[in-house]
């Protein structure tokens, strides 16, 4: 059994379509301000971040449209499933992210929601630019060609 100091990172939710729909420039790890019932619900593993994005309001970054379902045992003290959640970042990181969004037309999308070694909920946030339809087709062709090339190499030798 692992000791408390040797806890592994546990990925709870992953945005798999993000790498297909966006060209990812940079990633940042951010903490999330959560209530107790939200943490318990995340640990149950029913969270989705596929349709969510991050936006800035009043000099802070907020995670919008993420779905953390209600915790069944919480009764009336439950949280709202799709409420905006504040992301915990340093001021320099916030300025960098807001600058990229304002100047370069980038978007902030979550890639992974996980618990780190200390048991804290963290979000891997990406600065990304949306791909056009022809870019998506091109990346799909590259992926298919890579698979086909691997098959050919395995078949010959």
Curated annotation (Swiss-Prot):
Domain of life (superkingdom): Bacteria
Swiss-Prot/TrEMBL GO biological process terms: trans-translation
SUPFAM superfamilies, sorted: Small protein B (SmpB)
Bias type Basic and acidic residues, positions: 135-151
PROSITE patterns: SSRP
GO CC, any one term: cytosol
Keyword annotations: Cytoplasm, RNA-binding
Predominant location category: cytoplasm
InterPro entries the record matches: SmpB (IPR023620), SsrA-bd_prot (IPR000037), SsrA-bd_prot_CS (IPR020081)
Keyword Protease among record annotations: no
Region ranges (Disordered): 133-157
MF terms in GO: RNA binding
Alphabetical list of PANTHER family matching this protein: SSRA-BINDING PROTEIN, TMRNA-BINDING COMPONENT OF TRANS-TRANSLATION TAGGING COMPLEX
Function: Required for rescue of stalled ribosomes mediated by trans-translation. Binds to transfer-messenger RNA (tmRNA), required for stable association of tmRNA with ribosomes. tmRNA and SmpB together mimic tRNA shape, replacing the anticodon stem-loop with SmpB. tmRNA is encoded by the ssrA gene; the 2 termini fold to resemble tRNA(Ala) and it encodes a 'tag peptide', a short internal open reading frame. During trans-translation Ala-aminoacylated tmRNA acts like a tRNA, entering the A-site of stalled ribosomes, displacing the stalled mRNA.
Family statement drawn from the similarity comment of this UniProt entry: Belongs to the SmpB family.
Name the UniProt record assigns to this protein: SsrA-binding protein
Originating organism: Nitrobacter winogradskyi (strain ATCC 25391 / DSM 10237 / CIP 104748 / NCIMB 11846 / Nb-255)
